[in-house]
């Protein structure tokens, strides 16, 4: 692969992210879930101002009703069964209907900490890149695995967003770091090995948190992340309308929002059809 060409491709992708952050006053959202893999809804949220999208394999398992899963917790257990070809098809459809300045980062089987062996090779990464992806959304929990992903992605002009988790998290979604000091250390090392965007898993998706706020411990961890690196930063897990504003003073650049939007879209669909069957 031509190194110069792919470096230029990746730089263009990163500029999309930086432009989105600037456009939205220092903090924007990465819209995922149902808005990441359904071309109609992806187009709709982009028309509303969203600039960053994330199709991923557990969300596509939900969208396809794979093995009857009906919630993200269940989808995480069988996400590795969603093929790279299925993800590429979803990405290609979304890319076809959104403007070129929209950044698309993609979660694929093998890119997360999977429960069964899922090898990733040049073939899979090239397929995703050609489908229209700008980056890989990853959740590796081992340094060697993460380095391999970074090397593969960069070879084909894709950015990598990787995440820091907590050793006690219900699901393993990143390199573990228990204290803010460890978060800072892990983030710095991620930047050193070439990760383009670094996120923190809040742990709020499944563990729960008081409505309208985020725990002080998470604020401290986010500030440690933000203060440690120069690359764009993200927060993921349990973010909704009630607590989104609480992230503002942490300095994090991007809020990853999926389930909250999914729930609103599903509720809107229920409200839309009710008058037709209740007249």
PLM segments and residue spans:
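Active-site/ligand-binding-proximal alpha/beta "capping" segment
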Residues: 122, 197-242
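N-terminal amphipathic alpha-helix/helix-capping segment at the start of soluble metabolic enzymes
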Residues: 1-33
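Conserved anion-binding
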Residues: 101-210
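Glycine-rich phosphate-binding active-site loops on the catalytic face of alpha/beta enzymes
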Residues: 50-64, 127-145, 197-210, 250-272
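C-terminal helical cap(s) of enzyme catalytic domains, especially alpha/beta-barrels
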Residues: 64-81, 215, 258-279
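Active-site beta->alpha loop and helix N-cap motifs at the rims of alpha/beta catalytic domains
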Residues: 2-5, 41, 48, 52-53, ...
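Conserved, mostly hydrophobic/aromatic
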Residues: 45, 198, 247
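Alpha/beta catalytic cores of nucleotide-metabolism and tRNA/nucleoside-modifying enzymes
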Residues: 1-11, 178-185, 221-229, 240-279
């Amino acid at each position: 692969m031509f190194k110069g060409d792919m470096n230029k491709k990746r730089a263009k992708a990163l500029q999309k992210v930086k432009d989105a952050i600037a456009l939205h006053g220092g903090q924007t959202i990465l819209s995922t879930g149902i808005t990441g893999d359904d071309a109609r809804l992806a187009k709709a949220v982009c028309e509303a101002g969203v600039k960053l999208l994330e199709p991923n394999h557990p969300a596509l398992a939900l969208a396809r009703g794979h093995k009857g899963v009906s919630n993200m917790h269940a989808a995480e257990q069988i996400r590795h069964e969603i093929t790279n070809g299925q993800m590429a098809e979803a990405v290609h459809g979304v890319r076809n209907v959104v403007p070129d300045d929209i950044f698309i980062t993609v979660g694929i089987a093998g890119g997360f900490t999977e429960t069964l062996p899922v090898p990733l090779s040049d073939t899979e990464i090239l397929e995703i890149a050609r489908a229209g992806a700008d980056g890989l959304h990853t959740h590796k929990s081992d340094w060697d695995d993460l380095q391999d992903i970074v090397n593969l992605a960069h070879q084909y002009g894709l950015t990598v967003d990787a995440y820091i988790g907590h050793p006690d998290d219900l699901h393993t979604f990143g390199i573990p770091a228990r204290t803010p000091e460890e978060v800072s250390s892990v983030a710095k090392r991620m930047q050193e090995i070439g990760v383009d965007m670094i996120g923190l898993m809040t742990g709020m998706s499944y563990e729960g948190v008081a409505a309208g706020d985020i725990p002080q411990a998470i604020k401290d961890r986010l500030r440690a992340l933000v203060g440690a690196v120069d690359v764009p930063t993200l927060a993921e897990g349990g973010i909704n309308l009630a607590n989104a504003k609480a992230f503002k003073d942490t300095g994090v650049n991007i809020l990853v929002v999926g389930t909250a939007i999914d729930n609103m879209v599903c509720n809107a669909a229920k409200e839309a059809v009710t008058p037709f069957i209740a007249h």
